[in-house]
């Protein structure tokens, strides 16, 4: 029986209603497929990134073998350590004429320093005169030439104006500033106490010139690998004594983490030693009733100390080329208990690359004779005084040495 024409027309021409229920399965299917593709791509990219890191981590040998280190939380940068811009008041001297004038000494108004290319120079007024070279040329201050050219670090004036110099690679020297005559007192590489001198750093001399106290920062690392020494936290730094009469070298203290700057106490019965990696200053007793002992003079400094020098107030100037900002972030503090990250970093990057990430914050503090902080001078971005290694006071001015900057800085203390 045939359907009525009207009913058939309505069925054939009935409008199709498109509902959400009809499209949802198709939409969900597309989403699931896209999600799977995204996860596959993500896993693939992750594998491409992680696989090389795993290869680096397990197959490449790290140049350092870091030790677990425990540092206290850095002190707040407030009070005596309150940030300021006082180091920016300094004047740059002999820009691009002096590279890396690490340490400074004066005899009267004559200023002496050593440079990155192995020279000992005299500064008189506006002139620079080379008085001696400790190593052998060619000397361009490069990493490759440092061991043969020499790298003068600590410098002091002894009796009668004689200069005493600590060279990182070549040892201890006595230099006649008039004739330029050089005398090697202790050779680097010499075996002392069963270990070689590998990184002779700073020194001080008794008033009579009989004893020279000096630091050997490490028997494992050389100066050109100083960041390796800091990051590894190697405890092989030493304090030694050289007797100018008997010519004997004696180990006074060992197991220091980066023994750096050294300064005789006024009574000459003890020396202050910067233990750089630990952000503190130790006091080593070199004579008297406490000879052979050691205690902590200042702990938990706001930066990593380099050279220590007397101030006119009877206290001490301490230079720091890297700080431990609080509030803020200190990479060395963060990594101190993560030796595996240190190993990975040194597998991937060279020291020169890593130094580009070290903030150029320079800090100089003046300590009382008791070790309490008196005042501090800052250059938060190293805009004027960068990589400060020493603060040497003379005639109302503070001369600022640097282990890598191509200039010397001079700060008028009456203006700060």
From Swiss-Prot:
Protein name, as recorded: Adipocyte plasma membrane-associated protein
Disulphides: none
Keywords: Glycoprotein, Membrane, Signal-anchor, Transmembrane, Transmembrane helix
Family to which this protein belongs: Belongs to the strictosidine synthase family.
Species assigned in the record: Salmo salar
Compartmental location: Membrane
Glycosylation (residues): 160
GO MF term set: arylesterase activity
InterPro entries: 6-blade_b-propeller_TolB-like, Strictosidine_synth_cons-reg
Native organism taxonomy: Eukaryota, Metazoa, Chordata, Craniata, Vertebrata
Main location class: membrane
Pfam family, one: SSL_N
Topological type in the membrane: Single-pass type II membrane protein
GO cellular component terms, semicolon-separated: endomembrane system; membrane
Cytoplasmic membrane side: 1-39
Residue stretches spanning the membrane: 40-60
Record topology, Extracellular segments: 61-412
């Amino acid at each position: 029986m045939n359907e009525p024409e009207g009913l058939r027309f309505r069925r054939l021409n009935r409008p199709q209603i498109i509902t959400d229920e009809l499209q949802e399965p198709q939409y969900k299917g597309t989403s699931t497929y896209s999600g799977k593709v995204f996860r596959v791509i993500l896993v693939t990219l992750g594998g491409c990134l992680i696989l090389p890191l795993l290869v680096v981590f397990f197959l490449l040998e790290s140049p350092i073998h870091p030790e677990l280190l425990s540092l206290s939380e850095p002190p707040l940068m407030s009070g005596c350590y309150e940030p300021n811009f006082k180091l920016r008041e300094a004047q740059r001297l002999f820009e691009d004429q002096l590279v890396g004038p690490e340490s400074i000494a004066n005899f009267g108004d004559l200023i002496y320093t050593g440079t990155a290319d192995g020279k000992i120079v005299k500064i008189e007024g506006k002139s620079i005169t080379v008085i001696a070279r400790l190593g052998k040329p060619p000397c361009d201050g490069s990493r490759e030439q440092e061991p043969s050219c020499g790298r003068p670090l600590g410098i002091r004036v002894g009796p009668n104006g004689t200069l005493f110099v600590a060279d990182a690679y070549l040892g201890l020297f006595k230099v006649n500033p008039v004739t330029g005559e050089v005398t090697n007192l202790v050779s680097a590489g010499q075996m002392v106490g069963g270990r070689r001198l590998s990184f002779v750093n700073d020194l001080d001399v008794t008033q009579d010139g009989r004893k020279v106290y000096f630091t050997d920062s490490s028997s494992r690392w050389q100066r050109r690998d100083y960041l390796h020494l800091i990051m590894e936290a190697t405890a092989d730094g030493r304090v030694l004594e050289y007797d100018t009469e008997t010519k004997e070298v004696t180990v006074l203290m060992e197991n220091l983490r980066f023994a750096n700057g050294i300064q005789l106490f006024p009574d000459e019965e003890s020396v202050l030693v910067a233990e750089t990696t630990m952000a503190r200053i130790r006091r080593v007793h070199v004579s008297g009733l406490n000879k052979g002992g050691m205690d902590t003079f200042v702990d938990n400094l706001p930066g990593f100390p380099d050279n220590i020098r007397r101030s006119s107030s009877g206290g001490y100037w301490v230079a720091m080329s890297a700080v431990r900002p609080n509030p803020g972030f200190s990479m060395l503090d963060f990594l101190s208990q993560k030796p595996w990250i240190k190993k990975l970093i040194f597998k991937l990057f060279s020291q020169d690359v890593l130094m580009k990430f070290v903030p150029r914050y320079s800090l100089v503090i003046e300590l009382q004779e008791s070790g309490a902080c008196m005042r501090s001078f800052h250059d938060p971005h190293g805009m004027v005084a960068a990589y400060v290694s020493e603060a040497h006071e003379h005639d109302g001015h503070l001369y600022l040495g640097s282990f890598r900057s191509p200039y010397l800085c001079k700060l008028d203390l009456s203006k700060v």
